[in-house]
From Swiss-Prot:
This is Small ribosomal subunit protein uS5. It comes from Deinococcus geothermalis (strain DSM 11300 / CIP 105573 / AG-3a). Keywords: Ribonucleoprotein, Ribosomal protein, RNA-binding, rRNA-binding. With S4 and S12 plays an important role in translational accuracy. Located at the back of the 30S subunit body where it stabilizes the conformation of the head with respect to the body. SUPFAM superfamilies: dsRNA-binding domain-like, Ribosomal protein S5 domain 2-like. The lineage of its organism: Bacteria, Thermotogati, Deinococcota, Deinococci, Deinococcales. Belongs to the universal ribosomal protein uS5 family. NCBIfam families: rpsE_bact. One of its GO terms (molecular function) is structural constituent of ribosome. The N-terminal domain interacts with the head of the 30S subunit; the C-terminal domain interacts with the body and contacts protein S4. The interaction surface between S4 and S5 is involved in control of translational fidelity. Residues 16-79 form the S5 DRBM domain. GO terms for cellular component: small ribosomal subunit. The keyword Phosphoprotein does not apply.
Length: 177
């Protein structure tokens, strides 16, 4: 029985859906002519709250994409998704790019630019509003969206961080703080 490494690799990543957002070609001029290199921006997600982003660079596009996928697997984050949307409004920042992410009601859909929409859909967010502010460079916007999603907290997580878990319940029951 023969084994095919490519099939094994595809089986490994089958839990994640991938989306290639952007391929950039750069060139360097040498005495004999130009040499091209490629950079690929890839998003991986399971549509269930886990999403990762990677940028791979290589002399050929397929190699750059594979590198980007490997980097995206290493940079996975978990996004708190409540009823198909994010728990609260947040602004993600990277360089001169800022992205405003807002929760939306059921049936709204993902109203966003191409980069925030792709990341939100692969994270499992079905209702969200977004606005890109400042620079709209795809790489910087992607990093800004990830910054925003990484800093999201549910109400329960905030209570635990602040140590208010028991006090909030007492206040809701009509007790003293």
């Amino acid at each position: 029985m023969t084994f095919n490494r490519r099939n094994d690799r595809e089986r490994e990543t089958s839990e994640f859906e991938e989306k290639m957002l952007f391929v950039n070609r750069t060139s360097k001029t040498y005495q004999g002519g130009r040499r091209f290199r490629f950079a690929a921006l890839v998003i991986l997600g399971d549509r269930n709250g886990r999403v990762g982003m990677g940028i791979g660079k290589a002399k050929e596009v397929p190699v750059a994409i594979e590198k980007a996928k490997a980097i995206a697997r290493k940079n996975m984050i978990t996004v708190p998704v409540e009823n198909g949307t994010i728990p609260h409004e947040i602004v993600g920042e990277n360089s001169t790019s800022r992205v405003l992410l807002k929760p939306a009601g059921p049936g709204t859909g993902v109203i966003a630019g191409t980069v925030p929409r792709s990341i939100a859909e692969l994270a499992g967010i079905t209702n969200m509003l977004s606005k890109e502010l400042g620079s709209r460079n795809k790489i910087n916007v992607a990093y800004a969206v990830f910054d925003g999603l990484k800093n999201l907290r549910t109400a329960k997580q905030v209570r635990e961080i602040r140590g208010l878990d028991g006090q909030v319940r007492a206040a809701q029951a009509g007790g003293e703080l």
